[in-house]
Amino acid sequence: MESLLSIRGLNVEFQTPSGPLHVLRDINIDVPRGKILGIVGESGSGKSTVIWAINRLLASNGAINGGTATFDGQDLLALNDRQMLSVRGEQISMVFQDPMTSQIPVLTYDRQMSDIQYRRKELSMKDKRERAIRIMHKVGIPDPEDRILQYPHHFSGGMRQRAGIAMALLMDPLLLIADEPTTALDVTLEAQIIHLIQELRAEFDATIMVVSHNLGLIAELCDQVVVMYAGEVVEYGSVSNLFYEPAHPYTQALLNCDPARTQTKTRYLPVIPGDVPDLHVLPTGCIFAARCSQVMEQCKTTSPAKVQLDGSQHVASCHLLDPGLQASGDSPKNASPQGDVSGKVRPKPSVESEELLKVEDLCVRFQTNSWIRSKIQKRPRFVDAVIDASLSLRQGETLGLVGESGSGKTTLGRAILGLVQAESGSVIFDGQELRDLSRAGLSQLRRNMAMMFQDPVGSLSPRQTVRSLITEPFQIHRINADLDEEAARLCEMVRLPQDFLSRYPHELSGGQARRVGVARALALNPQIIIADEPTAGLDVSVQGEILNLMNELQETHGLSYLIISHNLPVIRHVSDRLAIMYLGRLVEFGDSDEIFSQPAHPYTQALVNGVPQPDPNRRRSLVSIEGEVPSLANRPAGCEFHTRCKYATADCRNMRPPLSQIRVNGLDREVACHYPLVGESGEQ
């Protein structure tokens, strides 16, 4: 199989105040023509550094210390800067992780796409615009003639990513590189982008590299997969090899950690113990030895050689695969699979558990024009972010709240805590109506309800130490306590070493910052924690650690959780009941297991079907939901989902369905649909 890009012996170092950082070591990767290659691994494994190195875009303190990167017959590492200008953008194009920061906010797409084509002197401005419009149409952007004149902030997240793909395709590149192309997207938009990449590959016979920590995305898209750990390639093979016959313990561990593969939600998620090693001082022997459940003495002293398996292109670096070792019988006996935690279960709360929180007909409205403009225009303009939301939370229960961006999930969570003022409705906690409480009474009640914010680093003051951050609630509520003692207690609860108390947020990893957020939320021993995207941006193993910690704290302290997320595998694993929101309204509410196995609302069905599975044989053939979420300022008449629903009828277009009770498999459920997909009143 001919390779478009062949990387051999690539080594990259970064100079830091602590000495050289050995980021990439002896990297060998082949990207076959017309194929999609995936690169996976935890944060810090070197995935993105490979991409920046072959594009010669390393930071000023980075250096390539050896190796070659042969692309279409020329070594990219031997080219000078002027020669590389004709490669970047023209022969190799990038789709970046965050289109909002990679696109220029003060330039229209017309201007940005014209600038990208600056080397095509033979094209007039009109020709460049027409070409850009054709590409925008190709990637599924509606009305490209009009939308090319708009700015990035006028586009939704999914449309911005489509525009980013259009920009990458403008110069007909030989190689398209997508760096975490769906990380910030909802499951429905993720499905659309995956479908688009598949179409581009089929139509243009494109060669694509995908960098991601999303195993479902890799299984859905890729032909070949490279697994990286701490700057080394530990396994390489076909997507079937990697998902069905993983040879390296690290690959096995990554797969076991994925909640989408853990069907029994009452189990604690498997995790990979320990942390990625410090690349300033490399350990002797196997780079993964310190975290491996199948480690041998040989692993600690000798680096493993690459072993080709079954005479195929499946290659892994592990002593366990050494034929000589297997023949001598020195391999470990009865070693549990990497990351296995079988037997650990989380009990499900009884349906008779005390109802701790009750939300009734809650509405939240935001003014969209400024106070001055509203006076000039004689009337303010409003959008309804949450409409008539009603739900309950029992003692010791986990309630999942899901929906696309803009559905009102976070606004509802903040309104429950009183962080956002509700227009109408009620929030009753432990028999007390929050609206009836004085400021002092509300402050007292807030000790029993805490919030974990979506961005753990952004929500922590960069000027405060961990000790100050996790003990601040005592000072806010004027509670006399030994702060040193409380800080030590909270660190122990969330398993943070005591020496972390003197660190600042920028010195923490994503998982460590998340633990600080959990500790801060637990400071005053609340009964309810509202967790907004508690695993967003985390690797699957770190994600498992945070979820296991939350489960353990729930068992120990009887906590109730309202978990807001668009990560459906996570929600399926942790939630007892589930609420689905669309355009500010609840459209389905009931038992989590039942909803995931038999969704009643078409929107819920589309969300569940849209989750990419870490199984190459379960690739989707259709996009789960077409179209964009309507604007809150211009809601559709009737059922608000009818503009995207494949089951919509005239009734759906004219009448809004109320949230009504149905019965499915003997359990009550609420659904807002004229024709529920399941249930006694609408069984299909």
Q: Where do the language-model regions lie?
A:
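P-loop NTP-binding/switch modules centered on Walker-like glycine-rich loops
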Residues: E42, R56, P181, L185-R267, ...
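ABC ATPase NBD coupling module
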Residues: L76-S93, R119, N241-P246, P277-P283, ...
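Conserved ABC ATPase signature
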Residues: Q150-F155, M159, Y504-L508, Q512
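Charged, flexible cofactor/metal-binding loops and thiol motifs
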Residues: S238-L356, T368-Q377, S592-Q684
